[in-house]
Amino acid sequence: GRLVKAFNTNTVINPIPVKYCKNINLANKLRKLCEDQIKDETIGIKAGGTGIQALKKLKEKEPFTAKVFKKRLVKSGQKVKINQHTKGIEVEVYYFIKKSFFDYKGKVTKSNVTKFIKFMGPCFEIVGFRQRNKKFTYLGDICGDFGFNIKFVVGRKTKFKKLNLNNLKTSLVSKKNGVKVNGNTNIVYINPLNSLRFVLNKVKKEKI
């Protein structure tokens, strides 16, 4: 209840008990319970905790999924308010999925995942906690807090093309202080399409 209120009012709360974070299964249950109480349109599903090195370090087998709500979506050019609990920004790829996917009975694989994609585009995810002085110790820390999502800033969608995103270097520069941060798509669960494959199979399995 406290997390849901924090989500709805854009406020922060004292940390939830660590027992809900240590066990990823409990964290997933908490996330789903909280998501079910949000009276807002679900516009997408994201993969969270996709950093391969982080997963190995945390001894977790796979990432998690989380709902993306309409009120969390921001169009390119709009302002986003942040606070000390905002932890960063991530460059992402988003995909629009064809309706035919929901009638498909088989498993989504690396070889067939592209046939379900209609559009694609760039986006930024603003990540952070709704809890005071929260530290990232377990995967459940970010999973249980609405998947660590604060806002999604989406760019223009284009018709899907089979682009090679396996080794795409990115660079973010702060206009305020000139700090530059480099990244690469190859650290995110192999590549964006593999993350999508994971999400689509979870959607089918859990009937999201």
Give the ranges of each region predicted by the language model:
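Conserved metal-binding segment of the jelly-roll/cupin
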Residues: I208
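Conserved RNP beta-strands of RNA recognition motif
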Residues: L200
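Catalytic-core "active-site belt" of small-molecule-metabolizing enzymes
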Residues: G1-R197, K205
